[in-house]
């Protein structure tokens, strides 16, 4: 099992599915979080920051900051990298659980997650931050796999709805 991927490496999987930069950031966060829950290790080495609209991997943001918020990232921006089977299966599971949600739905979900909330403690809701989102046994204790050892599928109505116009 290779675990020294970069977040940009992992991004290519989701870019090939057709995502905008906002949705990509949240899928990276959930990929890292659930990989930790399943394997007690990180999927990629990059840190995740607690930005106003949820978790962000800075290097991935810098790569796609030129794009309009809702624009789908061109598939040509995906790198051709062979991921191991464990990683592919994991990313398929993340996509099955979260891929049907919009970027704004995912923003809402992340704002309710303990790792992001803990990282934003003491900050105003509109205050920029580069604090790291900590993913560990304490912050992921409420994330549980279903009876088939899969990530539960998230329903749209489970989101808070605050960023639906985002």
Which sequence ranges carry the predicted segments?
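Domain-edge interaction signal
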Residues: 1-166
